Amino acid sequence: MKLSFILSTLVAGALAYNEFSAPGPNAVLQEGGGVNTVSWSNLTSSTVTLTLYRGGNSALTPIETIASDIDNTGTYLWNIATYYEAADDYLLGLSFDGGETYSQYFTLQACSTCTISTSSLSYSGTISSTSIAPSMIGTRTSSSYFITSSSSTPSSSSSSSSSSPSSSSSKSSSSSKSSSSSSSSSKSSSSSSSSSKSSSSSSSSSKSSASPSSSKSSSKFSSSSFITSTTPASSSSSGAIVSNAKTASTDDSSSASSATSSVSSVVSSASSALSASASSASASVSSSASSDASPALKTGINALVAVGVVSAIALFL
């Protein structure tokens, strides 16, 4: 009786409590492949918590709580999600009142029709690395991915998010500078245009100030056109004179002297008419010309009138 009690006590002491039986060493579990059965034996404690770990023997780190405070029945149906990175350094931990046990290392990978997504992992306890002997869980030399990724990802995210505004602000400042430059250039072009317009205005002013001489020239041309317009009248007079001359030539020789004298009188009257026309033209030119007309211009006009008179007389003769 005493011997059997001692033997049962020794056997119970040699057995580990809540020892994992599945998953087995180096098992391959499919993410998204359906329900996987997790089992353990030599039960103790009324409730247990199931946790997923990852990492090497010297840096084993909890990454997600699978089930918290479940009844200690020795089994759990685990429907593996598809957001775990495919790797071979996963294991399960079972915590209970008085201790914790671990499974052997196993592999997680996506099923043939599944795609691994990304999601935030949730762990309810304090994240700290644990060292477990290879004789208990197997051997892995990889370091903790969770600590590395969790510490680097937020910082990289914050750095990228912090760099984005600066980049945006630098772009905004560049855009502002560009718009300022374009505005300045447009203002410069406007100033250039204004200066060009000012120079044009000054040029127009200079042309306006030079208008008296052009007025004199136009007056000169007006006098010329006036004289030219008077020329047809003198031509009409010469036509009348020629007609009279032809009439006189039909008379007999006895009246030739009287015809000659009549021609002379007509020439005299034509000369008087041309002189009067020239005088009126000169008066018109003088009235249309400005008060500051040069003597040379007046002399030219008088000479032009004289040439017209002489030409008319020569035509009659």
From Swiss-Prot:
Keyword Signal: yes
One cellular component (GO) term of this entry: cell surface
Signal peptide start and end residues: 1-16
Transmembrane regions: none
UniProt keyword NADP present: no
Residues with glycosylation annotation: N42
Chain segments carrying region Disordered: 150-259
Organism encoding this protein: Schizosaccharomyces pombe (strain 972 / ATCC 24843)
Domain of life: Eukaryota
Keywords annotated in UniProt: Glycoprotein, Signal
Regions of compositional bias (Low complexity) in chain numbering: 150-238, 247-259
Name of this chain's protein: Uncharacterized serine-rich protein C1E8.05
